[in-house]
């Protein structure tokens, strides 16, 4: 491990975490991230133009292409931008709401997978590890890290409201489980983690490095184009220690494509949107076109995803509004990671993960605690959703197998919470 990765000082001040205070400052109001959309008037104008083109030149090679593009945009009216959804659309149902959920088994299983993978690699790293969670959302995994005796947690997300919820969750955890004696430094940062113009790590003091980087159920939002996924991977790897791990969970590309192809009439030459949809009463996946231009790489393969409770968008008539996601072509992702000195060490579908990890007593005990009614026939349709997902683990450095615990120096015992310069009412609390 290089010298720069070890340069922590217990006398550091909290404000020293940020490289430049001004760069981390945000306004109190939330400014929506606007998506470029055609107005209804522009769409009508385009329709008339296409109609005219058809009459004047029926052999126009671009006519059909333009027509399908316009039709696709019309059909995508029911698609919600993930940025808008997590900024404005999502409402946490709360603990009681989650308990009453019809997909409580799915939620529990996903939490078991995350708890197991976090537990395994935190133990490999040793006590006092530092964690960077990208797309941390409402902080649902905070306690999973705390139970592994980490010393530093930094959570970053695009949605301010989610981060405020994460800070509230942190306050509750430390009060109820740790009797106000949680000696872990926690920092939250609002930023677009895949913006090519904005590398949020440049805002953080260069002496801060991380032993574990995590991105759970969110990587698919960043596969929109090559620039965005590269910007994201730069953020994931740039401050990851040599020998550290990058862990995550995503929808598996092979599974989603196989299910799409198994749909009846999917090869029908007619463009019928409903034939690009699959799912059950709990979830739905919807593609908006059959063919994608991948001449510049397998990026931007957009689909809509709906999951009851978690992504619960319906219009006034009860029709589903899907949240946009992008297919992560994993083979391409592995090659991209190599550019950032990240090398694959583990990849498993959730069902295979369960089959393998349940053989270990440590994870079996965790399973007995977190998973109930495994043989209940009523959860069969939730297993169908579970099979969509996979976990991945990359290690920084191709031949680096050194996990010497002595290299991890304890961080500050003081625990402050920062959302850039936005301070919640409980931010003044310190812990001795």
Give the positions of each predicted feature:
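Class I SAM-dependent methyltransferase Rossmann-like catalytic core
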Residues: 72-125
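Conserved beta-strand signature within the Rossmann-like core of class I S-adenosyl-L-methionine
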Residues: 242-251
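Class I SAM-dependent methyltransferase SAM/SAH-binding core
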Residues: 140, 146-196
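Conserved Class I S-adenosyl-L-methionine
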Residues: 259-308
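C-terminal lobe and adjacent flexible extensions of AdoMet/dcAdoMet transferase-like proteins
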Residues: 290-432
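A short glycine-rich, Lys/Arg-flanked "PGG" loop and its adjoining helix->strand segment in the class I
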Residues: 228-242
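A short acidic, Gly/Pro-enriched loop at the edge of an enzyme's catalytic core
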Residues: 199-213
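Conserved class I S-adenosyl-L-methionine
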Residues: 128-137, 154
């Amino acid at each position: 491990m290089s010298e720069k990765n070890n340069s922590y000082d217990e006398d550091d001040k909290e404000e020293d975490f940020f490289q430049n205070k001004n760069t981390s400052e945000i306004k109190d109001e939330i400014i929506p991230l606007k998506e470029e959309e055609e107005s209804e008037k522009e769409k009508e104008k385009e329709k008339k133009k296409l109609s005219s083109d058809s009459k004047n030149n029926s052999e126009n090679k671009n006519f059909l292409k333009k027509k399908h593009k316009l039709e696709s945009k019309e059909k995508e009216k029911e698609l919600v931008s993930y940025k808008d959804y997590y900024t404005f659309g999502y409402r946490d149902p709360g603990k009681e709401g989650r308990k009453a959920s019809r997909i409580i088994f799915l939620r529990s299983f996903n939490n078991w997978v995350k708890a197991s993978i976090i537990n395994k690699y935190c133990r490999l790293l040793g006590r006092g590890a530092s964690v960077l969670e990208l797309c941390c959302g409402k902080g649902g995994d905070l306690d999973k890290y705390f139970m592994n005796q980490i010393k530093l947690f930094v959570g970053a997300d695009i949605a301010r409201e989610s981060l405020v919820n994460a800070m509230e969750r942190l306050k509750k955890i430390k009060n109820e489980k740790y009797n106000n004696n949680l000696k872990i430094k926690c920092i939250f940062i609002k930023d677009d983690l895949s913006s090519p113009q904005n590398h949020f790590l440049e805002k953080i003091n260069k002496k801060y490095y991380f032993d574990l980087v995590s991105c759970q159920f969110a990587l698919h939002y960043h596969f929109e184009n090559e620039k965005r996924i590269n910007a994201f991977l730069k953020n994931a790897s740039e401050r990851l220690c040599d020998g550290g791990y990058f862990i995550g969970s995503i929808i598996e590309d092979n599974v989603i494509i196989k299910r799409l192809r198994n749909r009846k009439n999917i090869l029908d030459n007619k463009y019928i949107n409903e034939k690009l949809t699959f799912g059950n009463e709990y979830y739905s996946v919807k593609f908006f076109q059959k063919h994608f231009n991948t001449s510049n790489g397998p990026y931007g393969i957009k689909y809509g995803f709906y999951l009851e409770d978690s992504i619960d968008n319906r219009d006034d008539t009860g029709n589903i509004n899907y949240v946009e996601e992008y297919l992560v072509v994993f083979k391409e992702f592995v090659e991209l990671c190599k550019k950032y000195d990240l090398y694959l060490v583990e990849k498993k579908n959730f069902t295979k993960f369960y089959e393998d990890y349940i053989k270990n007593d440590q994870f079996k005990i965790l399973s007995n605690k977190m998973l109930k009614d495994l043989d209940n026939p009523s959860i069969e349709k939730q297993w169908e959703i579970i099979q969509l997902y996979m976990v991945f683990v990359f290690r920084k450095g191709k031949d680096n197998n050194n996990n010497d615990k002595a290299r991890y120096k304890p961080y500050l015992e003081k625990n402050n919470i920062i959302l850039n310069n936005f301070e919640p009412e409980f931010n003044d609390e310190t812990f001795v």
